Each structure stands twice: as C-alpha cells, then as structure tokens.
C-alpha cells in the first residue's frame, strides 16, 4: 500500500488513521526553537465525522487510504436504502442512512451526487450544491409585516425546513444551498 510522508501533507489528502479513513483539513509545518520539527494537522474522520488535531514528527509516514469520489445519479429510496446509478456504466449502488447522514433532505430525483467509496463501500454522500424544491408549508406573508425581517420557516417537498423571505408562498419552487441549508432565490 502507498504511504505519504509529512512532507506530502496538504489539505484534501486522504490517509488511514486508527483504522479509519481521514482527510486533512489544515496542516502547518512547525519548527520550534528547541526540539524536533513537526507537522500540526487538523483532520476529519470520514466515517465518524470527528475533527481532530494531531501532531506528526517531521519525516514520519502514514498509510494512504483507498478512498475515491465518484459522480452518481440519485434514483430512488426503499425502506432502508437509497439507490444511486453511475451515469456511464449504469451500475447501481445502495447507500444506508449512516453513510447518507442528514443529506437525505436534499435528494431529488436525478440529482447528481458525489459518493465517497472506501474499499468498495459507500461512506459518504455529497448532494449537489444547489437544489430546487417546492414549498409545501409556510405561514402566509402579511403585507407590511416586516418587523424582524428574519423571514419565516418553510417546509419543502423533501421534508427539509429552511428560512425564507416573507414573500415566498406555498407552491413556489425555491433554490436552496445544500451546504448551508439557506434559501438562495425563487425559481421562475
């Protein structure tokens, strides 16, 4: 298996730490005035989602993780699994709720998602950055009701709840940023 030296560390590098695939979020080479140089890294474990800060001695090595990201198209959901299809090979893959996390609220038919595979099994799903969803429930916006200007909560067709401006009505389609869960615009 391939390995990486601390000299190869950069954000986005994936490796194995404590038997779990991790990705480097930040790294910094530190050369103290006294003592051995080291690399301070902030890593995120891909399965558990924990963020840790670990120091590696200068020149030490870590094992490379066999982690690959693929583009898949969301197909459908049954009771326990969500199914995605590869757009070129038409191969289907099933993903459980542990790998999907809370991203199920952003999945719409034919959505292009990025699935992270480790040793052939799905460990994470990244939905598209923006999705267009219909508002199925929200309070009516009253004319002149602008005190607070914080907007109002709206329930979308997938069950997600986002804050929207007062002018958004039931039945309208809105664009939502899935990374932050915030309203972006109305769709014409």
Swiss-Prot record:
GO terms for molecular function: translation elongation factor activity. Pfam families: EFP, EFP_N, Elong-fact-P_C. May be beta-lysylated on the epsilon-amino group of Lys-34 by the combined action of EpmA and EpmB, and then hydroxylated on the C5 position of the same residue by EpmC (if this protein is present). Lysylation is critical for the stimulatory effect of EF-P on peptide-bond formation. The lysylation moiety may extend toward the peptidyltransferase center and stabilize the terminal 3-CCA end of the tRNA. Hydroxylation of the C5 position on Lys-34 may allow additional potential stabilizing hydrogen-bond interactions with the P-tRNA. It is found in: Cytoplasm. It comes from Glaesserella parasuis serovar 5 (strain SH0165). SUPFAM superfamilies: Nucleic acid-binding proteins (SSF50249), Translation proteins SH3-like domain (SSF50104). Involved in peptide bond synthesis. Alleviates ribosome stalling that occurs when 3 or more consecutive Pro residues or the sequence PPG is present in a protein, possibly by augmenting the peptidyl transferase activity of the ribosome. Modification of Lys-34 is required for alleviation. This is Elongation factor P. Keywords: Cytoplasm, Elongation factor, Hydroxylation, Protein biosynthesis. Pathway: Protein biosynthesis; polypeptide chain elongation. Disulfide bonds: none annotated.
């Amino acid at each position: 298996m391939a390995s990486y030296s601390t000299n190869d560390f950069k954000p986005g590098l994936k490796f194995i730490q404590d038997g779990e695939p991790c990705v480097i979020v930040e790294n910094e080479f530190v050369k103290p005035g006294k003592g051995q140089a080291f690399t301070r890294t902030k890593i995120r474990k891909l399965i558990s989602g924990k963020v840790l800060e670990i120091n590696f001695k200068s020149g030490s090595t870590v094992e490379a993780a066999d982690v690959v990201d693929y583009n898949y198209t969301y197909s459908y959901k049954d009771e326990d699994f969500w199914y995605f299809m590869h757009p070129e090979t038409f191969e289907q893959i099933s993903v459980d709720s542990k790998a999907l996390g809370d991203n199920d609220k952003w999945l719409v038919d034919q959505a292009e998602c990025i699935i992270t595979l480790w040793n052939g099994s799905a460990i994470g799903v990244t939905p598209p950055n923006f999705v267009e969803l219909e508002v199925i429930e929200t309070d009516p916006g009253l004319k002149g009701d602008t005190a607070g200007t914080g907007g109002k909560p709206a329930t979308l067709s997938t069950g997600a709840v986002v804050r929207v401006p007062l002018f958004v009505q039931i039945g309208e389609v809105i664009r939502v940023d899935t990374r932050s869960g915030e309203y972006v615009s109305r769709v014409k």
